[in-house]
Amino acid sequence: MFLAVLYCLLWSFQISDGHFPRACASSKNLLAKECCPPWMGDGSPCGQLSGRGSCQDILLSSAPSGPQFPFKGVDDRESWPSVFYNRTCQCSGNFMGFNCGNCKFGFGGPNCTEKRVLIRRNIFDLSVSEKNKFFSYLTLAKHTISSVYVIPTGTYGQMNNGSTPMFNDINIYDLFVWMHYYVSRDTLLGGSEIWRDIDFAHEAPGFLPWHRLFLLLWEQEIRELTGDENFTVPYWDWRDAENCDICTDEYLGGRHPENPNLLSPASFFSSWQIICSRSEEYNSHQVLCDGTPEGPLLRNPGNHDKAKTPRLPSSADVEFCLSLTQYESGSMDRTANFSFRNTLEGFASPLTGIADPSQSSMHNALHIFMNGTMSQVQGSANDPIFLLHHAFVDSIFEQWLRRHRPLLEVYPEANAPIGHNRDSYMVPFIPLYRNGDFFITSKDLGYDYSYLQESDPGFYRNYIEPYLEQASRIWPWLLGAALVGAVIAAALSGLSSRLCLQKKKKKKQPQEERQPLLMDKDDYHSLLYQSHL
């Protein structure tokens, strides 16, 4: 019955976020460099007739990039998305999307006016049914072809500058795998030449905002695919872990009994095929990953190079990261010292904050530890552990934002590695998002973490302090009222005692003594409320 429902769902939903909109993948759109599809609600481009948005020229930042990429005009991702499009939808108010058909993160309802905050939870706190539902959603996404998005299989030059489009269909899960590959791939310089020192989502300031957006879009896709408006990705809290405690068949897949590099046949994910894992092959042929299946998921946790990654991160490591006051420093790349971003990403020591090329720690340590598909940057998103891992990394980013409350100006405006400046549009997303747009608290983006709710100092500051301040202003009146109340209570008590004595004298047989119910339901709630304050 479950499989029947799953496969009925398989073909019945359409989704609306990813990379290249199918509606903008024609030679007409590429030659015109315009991506302003109609909103199906009124049929007008960008929903303009309904006031949702309009087709506008893209305004690119003129801030200079760092010296890490010494070329210009050789990579389609430069000045994203200007190689492909120079006009896209600019949405109004709380509307969002490549055709302004969606709501901004944190808003819902037909007119995007309903504010919402959803909670990401620890995967070990999910019930069996919740956990299995999450896995079924992953499976559904893996088997559902996107009706809205396609992926390019060639560079703009290989497409004859747009006159011969080269695009493939792709399933929803692999769409995000492909995006992670595309943003981190090497630059193809022609012939056999490549440039490796480039990455639009790693080793620089945009690492945390980019992956934050990636997860938000992924959640949005799953909600639209399944109709589950409350879906959030769970996180894996790996602090102080001695092994991969989610690498069991009950969760993300145990070890194969005969081949330790494969997943157990009993795992949800043992039959999954991966894509975009052969970077050297693509480089040698000067081609892009085209989404062709390349074999099963590989994972052999713990059998990695322990000289480079001696252990998984500890609570103390996380706390040290959070204590760093600078988001970014120096050259703003993998050599940055005392940088929160570089330390959390794993290129600087979580003991000293000094960049150490001989070690991989924090975020990087988990990738290395998995010793398989997840250990190669471009193809790492094939493994569903990637989602849970990055959800927890994002929660650490969120803790840092709440603790230090940085202004937007803290995020570098210029001279960061290419694609990582504050106002740079993030590759390869359409609609367009800037790095700085996600340098804000998660609550402003419509989500929170279950373990941060209890310890959020903002709760005390925003909700408890005002009541205490109000109480301090009226305490003299409260004291006076209490004294008057005590006098009245004493008088009533005396009168009650006299009446009771008179009644006892009249009765010949003694009455059974009863203990009052001090913890009646309403009394208990009142006591809890006062004790919590």
UniProtKB/Swiss-Prot annotation:
- Signal sequence interval, chain numbering: 1-18
An individual GO BP term: response to blue light
- Processing and modification events after translation: Glycosylated.
What domain of life is recorded for the organism? Eukaryota
Q: Which GO terms describe its molecular function?
A: copper ion binding; identical protein binding; protein homodimerization activity; tyrosinase activity
What subcellular locations does the record give? Answer: Melanosome membrane; Melanosome
Q: How is the cofactor bound?
A: Binds 2 copper ions per subunit.
Matches recorded under Pfam families? Tyrosinase
Per the record, its GO cellular-component terms are: melanosome; melanosome membrane; membrane; perinuclear region of cytoplasm
The impact of changing residue 482 to T is: In chinchilla mice
Provide the membrane topology annotation: Single-pass type I membrane protein
Which sequence ranges are listed under topological domain Lumenal, melanosome?
Answer: 19-476
Record-linked InterPro entries:
Di-copper_centre_dom_sf, Tyrosinase/Hemocyanin, Tyrosinase_Cu-bd
Its biological purpose: This is a copper-containing oxidase that functions in the formation of pigments such as melanins and other polyphenolic compounds. Catalyzes the initial and rate limiting step in the cascade of reactions leading to melanin production from tyrosine. In addition to hydroxylating tyrosine to DOPA (3,4-dihydroxyphenylalanine), also catalyzes the oxidation of DOPA to DOPA-quinone, and possibly the oxidation of DHI (5,6-dihydroxyindole) to indole-5,6 quinone.
> What disease is recorded for this protein?
Defects in Tyr result in various forms of albinism. Himalayan strain tyrosinase is temperature-sensitive.
Its quaternary organisation is:
Forms an OPN3-dependent complex with DCT in response to blue light in melanocytes.
Q: What is this protein called?
A: Tyrosinase
What organism does the record attribute this protein to?
Answer: Mus musculus (Mouse)
Coding gene?
Answer: Tyr
